[in-house]
Amino acid sequence: MKSKNPSHTHIIRRLVQFGFALFILVTAARHGLGGEEAGVASTDALCPFGGLETLWRLVVNGRYIPKTHASNVVLGVGLLVGTVLAGGAFCGWICPFGGLQDLLTALRRRLRVPELRVPDKADRILGYGRYLVLAGILYATVSTAKLWFASFDPYRTIFSLSWLFEFNWATSWPAYTISLAIIVGSFFVPRLWCRYLCPLGGTLSLLSRISLFRIRRDTSTCIDCKKCDKACPVRIKVSDKRSVTADCIGCLQCIETCPVPDTLYVGTIVESAHAAESKEGVA
């Protein structure tokens, strides 16, 4: 029986999440206190989704959408390449907003508040929301040549610390309202934003389908205990799959929870169905 103590992988992931969140918050605080005059860029320049938003305008006429920079494009393209290699690991290891939602889930469990379970059918339907949000944002951004989503983005609202340095309810109430709703909702529904609304998550889920590395399940040793399903923060039915791709955030919690050694493992896209079962040639 596995220990209930956090694994080394779990601890490392939490430290990485905390480190990136701290970096963003410190950058936001320095910018809020000194501004660009002090040589500190805003958190807008550190957002990879900004690179995707401005990419069309940059390709068409060589200009950036206001508030985006070359750094956004570099981060955005780098993230896309990284996703083709490692799937949605950015969401599970790096994204500060994902880390915040994990923190809310941990708090809920500590307080012994029951999770609000979304029925499977509703979960599948709501999952398409990310793609609708993504399409709407890209259309509005291309049409207006403005960072249209910035006025509503809960990640930007929270981690830019605008509510601390530039609080203005009259002009920013939509962003504050959405952010509060997402925080409250994520307390009861694990990774609510990631699963149903995040446009960047929607983009990465599409690319994750062709990722080089992904979690695989050895069907010959699986005992169908479904502990992996319960452990998954985005509620993927891992026990029904031989290869986990699209919605996986790469947190590895399913592997850590599995009671049968090597039944769940990190494999590659080039493995054949036989290799997935026999585990011959696993990297």
Predicted regions and their residues:
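Non-ligating segments of multi-cofactor redox enzymes
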Residues: 1-231, 235-239, 246-247, 253-283
